[in-house]
From Swiss-Prot:
GO BP terms, alphabetized: sperm individualization
Pfam families: SOTI
Name used for this protein in its record: Male-specific protein scotti
Lineage per the UniProt record: Eukaryota, Metazoa, Ecdysozoa, Arthropoda, Hexapoda
Signal peptide per UniProt: none
Length: 167
């Protein structure tokens, strides 16, 4: 097979290829992508009309100009309705992924990994409270602590809470 340099080609050959393509496509020399270019042209006309309508605001205030020059949100629906009308449908732009807040990320806490430290007095009181009816639990807890928090049960305070973390 012979390799042909593009510069060595006859320019008339390219015209012949264009004419054959026109005959096959049936567009008689009109090489435009009709519906796609029409949609793009409509969008450009809308943007131009938008710019012309707000030109005095843009000229007077720089911040307003920045806001008005931002792309239209959401994009015009005419681009995506072509499939319903029998034309070429353009794919929708991908949706933005939601950014995850670090407040919602689950991390292991101290309470899940280890039990809070409790002194033996409160452990015994909580076990004893389980045997009492719910209406009497507060009163029973106070009585239990009063009776059992004595120097006989806890000589020299050994076993009693010595800092708030043990409660």
């Amino acid at each position: 097979m012979e390799v042909v340099d593009p510069e060595d080609r006859d320019p008339d050959d390219m015209l012949l290829i264009d004419r054959i393509g026109d005959a096959v496509a049936g567009d008689a020399g009109n090489d435009s992508d009709s519906q796609e270019e029409q949609l793009e042209h409509q969008v450009l006309e809308q943007q131009l009309a938008h710019h012309q309508a707000h030109h005095p605001l843009r000229r007077d205030n720089r911040h307003v100009a920045m806001l008005l020059d931002a792309p239209l949100e959401p994009p015009p629906m005419g681009l995506f309705e072509g499939a319903r009308a029998g034309g070429v449908a353009h794919p929708r732009p991908p949706a933005r992924s939601k950014k995850r807040s670090f407040f919602t990320i689950v991390r292991p806490t101290v309470l899940r990994n280890q039990r809070p430290e409790l002194c033996p007095l409160f452990l015994n009181a909580s076990r004893a409270i389980g045997e009492v009816r719910e209406e009497q639990r507060g009163e029973f807890f106070a009585e239990y602590l009063f009776e059992n928090m004595t120097s006989e049960n806890y000589p020299n305070g050994v076993g009693l809470p010595h800092h708030w973390g043990q409660l």
